[in-house]
């Protein structure tokens, strides 16, 4: 078990020993303030792209629903006729092969799982690199007519100047003990929210969209979203037409036992969703961006296995590689027939689209009020 896993589990348990790390958090806070100010006053150089940049990020460690939000925004902008591209650092990919454009053929172990998911879902122009300036350069070289760039998870990357900032906050999870890393799971202080549009991610049936003790002094306008689960899909469909591997299976029924396997930032949300859908969930949380193996997944083959869309990207790549290597045994084929994906769609409030329209109009990008 690595140190990241130990601390993450301690956050979840609200372990008392975390307060021993408070001096480290104070030092981290000081460094964050100095770093941000250095970019503001020009001591550290920053880059302004030739077209507007919209940053989507969060101030907490772990998943907040950022990727589904980006997918929803890209789809909306595409349907309004806006030429939009996306950049990302490509976490989980191979930085030695970056900067790189992301296509539907890109392997997740090269460009990262989230970029693959975004491009496979939307078909948008996208580039990845830890150096955001290089990512923008290669993106605009390939797509010179882009009007807007969305930067995935670039909130703390102050080397990139931005025109719009949207921060996603998980209203149910909140901010824990409200301490910065490593005592708590905040990347930046809660006061950082004053400088950005805050999108409160809440449950569809939540009676309150946010924890007032955390947020009531910060905003006068609340933008909200929730994740709507779609129908279960076979992870590997017969449409792949590869090596005549046609998988036909019945979706697990409500009340049946399922293995929920998840390597995302906040897996509990995924488990809670499956429970709410009526499944008897056997949870298997893994670290974010975890690299699964087919052998590892075999241990769960006694029941249907349900994964997230992000994990499905990597698992499909494993299956494809096994087929190419002619290593897809009968045992693996049986496993493939038990693998299911639960896609989710980010549903945004009207105020999100209204705010987006207003912000883009100030950048001379015309967008209608029509929501998706």
Swiss-Prot record:
Any one biological process term the GO annotation gives: lipid A biosynthetic process
Binding positions for ATP per the UniProt entry: 60-67
UniProt pathway: Glycolipid biosynthesis; lipid IV(A) biosynthesis; lipid IV(A) from (3R)-3-hydroxytetradecanoyl-[acyl-carrier-protein] and UDP-N-acetyl-alpha-D-glucosamine: step 6/6
Keywords annotated in UniProt: ATP-binding, Kinase, Lipid A biosynthesis, Lipid biosynthesis, Lipid metabolism, Nucleotide-binding, Transferase
GO cellular component: plasma membrane
Task of the protein: Transfers the gamma-phosphate of ATP to the 4'-position of a tetraacyldisaccharide 1-phosphate intermediate (termed DS-1-P) to form tetraacyldisaccharide 1,4'-bis-phosphate (lipid IVA).
Family: Belongs to the LpxK family.
Entry protein name: Tetraacyldisaccharide 4'-kinase
Species annotation: Psychrobacter cryohalolentis (strain ATCC BAA-1226 / DSM 17306 / VKM B-2378 / K5)
């Amino acid at each position: 078990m690595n140190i990241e896993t130990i601390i993450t589990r301690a956050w979840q348990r609200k372990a008392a020993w975390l307060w021993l790390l408070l001096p480290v958090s104070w030092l981290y806070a000081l460094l964050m303030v100095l770093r941000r100010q250095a970019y503001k006053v020009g001591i550290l150089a920053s880059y302004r792209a030739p077209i507007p940049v919209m940053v989507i990020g969060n101030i907490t460690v772990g998943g907040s629903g950022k990727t589904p939000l980006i997918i929803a925004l890209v789809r909306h902008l595409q349907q309004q006729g806006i030429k939009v591209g996306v950049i990302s650092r490509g976490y989980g990919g191979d930085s030695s092969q970056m900067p790189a454009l992301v296509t539907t053929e890109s392997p997740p172990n090269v460009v990262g799982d989230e970029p693959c998911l975004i491009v496979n879902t939307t078909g948008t122009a996208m580039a990845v690199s830890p150096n955001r300036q290089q990512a923008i350069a290669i993106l605009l070289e390939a797509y010179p007519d882009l009007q807007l760039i969305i930067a995935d998870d670039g909130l703390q990357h102050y080397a990139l100047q931005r025109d719009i900032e949207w921060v996603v906050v998980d209203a149910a999870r909140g901010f824990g003990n409200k301490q910065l890393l490593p005592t708590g799971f905040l990347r930046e202080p809660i006061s950082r929210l004053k400088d950005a549009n805050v999108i409160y991610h809440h449950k569809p049936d939540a009676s309150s969209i946010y924890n007032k003790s955390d947020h009531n002094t910060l905003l006068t306008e609340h933008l909200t979203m929730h994740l709507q689960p779609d129908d279960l899909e076979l992870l590997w469909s017969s449409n792949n037409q590869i090596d005549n591997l046609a998988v036909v299976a019945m979706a697990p029924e409500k009340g049946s036992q399922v293995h929920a396997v998840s390597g995302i930032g906040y897996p509990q949300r995924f488990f809670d969703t499956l429970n709410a859908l009526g499944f008897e969930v056997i949870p298997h949380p893994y670290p974010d961006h975890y690299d699964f193996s087919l052998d590892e997944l075999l241990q769960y083959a006694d029941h249907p296995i349900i994964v997230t869309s992000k994990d499905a990207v990597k698992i499909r790549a494993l299956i494809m590689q096994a087929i190419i290597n002619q290593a897809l045994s009968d045992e693996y084929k049986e496993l493939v027939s038990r693998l299911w994906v639960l896609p989710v769609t980010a549903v945004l409030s009207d105020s999100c689209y209204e705010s987006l329209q207003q912000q883009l109009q100030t950048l001379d990008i015309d967008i209608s009020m029509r929501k998706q």
